[in-house]
Amino acid sequence: MFRAAAPGQLRRAASLLRFQSTLVIAEHADDSLAPITLNTITAATRLGGEVSCLVAGTKCDKVAQDLCKVAGIAKVLVAQHDVYRGLLPEELTPLILATQKQFNYTHICAGASAFGKNLLPRVAAKLEVAPISDIIAIKSPDTFVRTIYAGNALCTVKCDEKVKVFSVRGTSFEAAATSGGSASSEKASSTSPVEISEWLDQKLTKSDRPELTGAKVVVSGGRGLKSGENFKLLYDLADQRHAAVGASRAAVDAGFVPNDMQVGQTGKIVAPELYIAVGISGAIQHLAGMKDSKTIVAINKDPEAPIFQVADYGIVADLFKVVPEMTEILKKK
């Protein structure tokens, strides 16, 4: 039996929504916005109330202009200074605290990337609140869902903190539309440089393949490949479909590939349209990082491998025969 909410309850709920306001911390590289920020904006809009976005950097005018066009954002706050080079958390934290104090935001969030995981615990500590990490759903302005036990269980968290600080798993929310918005832009609160650390340099690996967390197709290899040289089989296959290449923790620990390729609970979380797992047994830590993929194809010679339990399509065969055959077929198409 359902009971209609009393008019007083509805008025109180509407009043609470009017007072909700969320600050999204933008992750970017000065000239381009990190895709996970768009997913975070979508999560923020589900809280109700006004959504603002804070952009800090050295030359971030283009990113700020792009954010003004994103659907769901009411205001873009821009802070430009040399100390924000590299988006160091030591410098960003005072800026975020000053912005929160000025506008009295009820929620502060960022993507659950290395950037967000490095920044938000510091912000929460300064606000003297407990942060919530890696949320996958929002039930209400004070109730969030996150995974525990390597993704095998869901935990619903009710947060009574005065300011809710949380990071968002990008694969759990659609990206916000990059057009249709008309947000205003203004300068953020000025803060004095902390200067307890200095950004020196960053060298990015250049590749014709897409970035792992944003790719539509991912080909990942495990210990079954037996060596780093054999990962060339996956590179050849991936190049036929403009796919990214990942790896299991076992392959990374064995020294086959660098750890920036690791997919899993302690690596990167991916949810591509197609995920091809080659020579991966399917430890729960790996499954936690890829089980939200739309279609999963597993190739393993062991028919009892756990990876087949989550796969949509399974091939029980020797990967050293199957993968080259797949590559040749795709080359002809």
UniProtKB/Swiss-Prot annotation:
Keyword Flavoprotein assigned: yes
Location within or outside the cell: Mitochondrion matrix
Native organism: Pongo abelii (Sumatran orangutan)
Cofactor note: Binds 1 FAD per dimer.
Binding of FAD, residues: 223, 248, 263-266, 281-286, 300, 318-319
Lineage of producing organism: Eukaryota, Metazoa, Chordata, Craniata, Vertebrata
Name of this chain's protein: Electron transfer flavoprotein subunit alpha, mitochondrial
Gene Ontology MF terms in the entry: electron transfer activity; flavin adenine dinucleotide binding
Keyword annotations: Acetylation, Electron transport, FAD, Flavoprotein, Mitochondrion, Phosphoprotein, Transit peptide, Transport
Post-translational modification Phosphoserine, affected residues: 140
Modified residues (N6-succinyllysine): 59, 69, 158, 187, 203, 216, 226, 232, 301
This protein's domain notes: Domain I shares an identical polypeptide fold with the beta subunit ETFB though there is no sequence similarity.
Function: Heterodimeric electron transfer flavoprotein that accepts electrons from several mitochondrial dehydrogenases, including acyl-CoA dehydrogenases, glutaryl-CoA and sarcosine dehydrogenase. It transfers the electrons to the main mitochondrial respiratory chain via ETF-ubiquinone oxidoreductase (ETF dehydrogenase). Required for normal mitochondrial fatty acid oxidation and normal amino acid metabolism.
Region annotation (Domain I) ranges: 20-204
Phosphothreonine carried by residues: 93
Region (Domain II): 205-333
Cofactor: FAD
GO terms under cellular component: mitochondrial matrix
InterPro entries linked: DHS-like_NAD/FAD-binding_dom, ETF_a/b_N, ETF_a/FixB, ETF_alpha_N, ETF_asu_C, ETF_asu_C_CS, Rossmann-like_a/b/a_fold
Record note on quaternary structure: Heterodimer composed of ETFA and ETFB. Identified in a complex that contains ETFA, ETFB and ETFRF1. Interaction with ETFRF1 promotes dissociation of the bound FAD and loss of electron transfer activity. Interacts with TASOR.
Transit peptide: 1-19
